[in-house]
Amino acid sequence: MTAPILIRPATRDDAAAMAAIEVAAAQRFREIGMTHIAEAEPTDTAAVLVRIDGGRAYVAVDAHGACVGFAFYRLLDAQRLYLEELDVAPSHAGQRIGARLIEQVMARAAQDGIAEVVLSTFREAPWNAPYYARLGFEVLDDAMLDDMLRTIRAYHVSLGLDETQRVFMRLRVSG
């Protein structure tokens, strides 16, 4: 039996653990030849703190209070939240922690009257687009991308990401 996991808003005290989780989770990309992702620096601490201070981050903590996963999100417009990042410590993979973090983001979206949650992810990595599809996310064709999503894509390109390997996805918020 797995230990209970609590999902809660992130605090500044979680920032260092979130960075460690981001680095550890990125190591999976070595398995599929994407070493540049595995070797990338974690999100800048100042940017993490902005998300935390703005109430745009959730963490998953174990029974001992240790952070084992996190999600960053932001409001895109009146109808959409953007799931910026989702990471789970490899030591806690397979326990539905990522799904629970997404459920929390979806609940927040529903509470705020948001119609959908969108994200951008790698198309082929098994723990990326295929995982999100299992959770109900659907792929957005390039023709469906508006200026906001194209701006996100351009930002990713500026970071050195190959957007031909990525896809935008969405999940409509119920209730």
Indicate where each model-derived feature is located:
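Acetyl-CoA-dependent GNAT
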Residues: 9-15, 19-90, 102-104, 108, ...
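Extreme N-terminal starter segment of soluble prokaryotic enzymes
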Residues: 4-6
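Conserved beta-strand-loop-alpha-helix junction that forms the acyl-donor binding cleft
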Residues: 119-128, 145-150
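Conserved GNAT acetyl-CoA-binding A-motif
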Residues: 109-121
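Short, well-ordered coil/turn elements that cap or connect secondary structure elements
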Residues: 2, 52-53, 134
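Short Asp/Glu-rich motifs
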Residues: 37, 41, 128-129, 151-152
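Terminal substrate-recognition subdomain of acyl/acetyltransferases
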Residues: 120, 134, 138, 142, ...
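Conserved glycine-rich acetyl-CoA-binding loop
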Residues: 66, 89-103, 112, 123-129, ...
